[in-house]
Amino acid sequence: LPLECKPFSVGFRAEHLQSDIEQSLYHGAAGHPALPRGEYQLSQHVRDGRCVYTFCMCPGGTVCAAASEAGGVVTNGMSLHARDGRNANAAVVVSVDGRDFDGDPAKAVAFQRRLEQAAFRAGGGDYRAPAETVGSFLAGGGKLDLGRVQPTYPRGVTPCDLGGLLPGELSAA
């Protein structure tokens, strides 16, 4: 049975206040009970044919642990039925494909495993997630000045330069 390298994406979860999303979308009507919870989708095609996009936006949701192997950190998001949590979150990801692994599926799996293990180490080796603000990531900083947004990840977070976890071409995208 042939095994082929399938495109996938890697990245991070961004958390922000649900009220900020709704203010941006609904302006003066934000918070009106007749309006749905605010959602968004962003995408941008960048160099080398890659795409950076948001995925699985969770209004009023939380960030949860989703690792499938010991010694790895993977995050996912979820919203409960009411979607009434203080924060919203979305995955911000960049596409990777066979050219990143010479078309070798084993190299793709090894790449994913290395990222998950690097996240584990960057989080402190105790299943906390590495974290930084979006502004810091874009500036190449590694700062975690939480301000009004308190992370929902149940194991906690550790300040980290997330750009250093991804290969340069993916982080630069």
Regions found by a protein language model. Name each.
Residues 1-173:
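Residues forming the flavin
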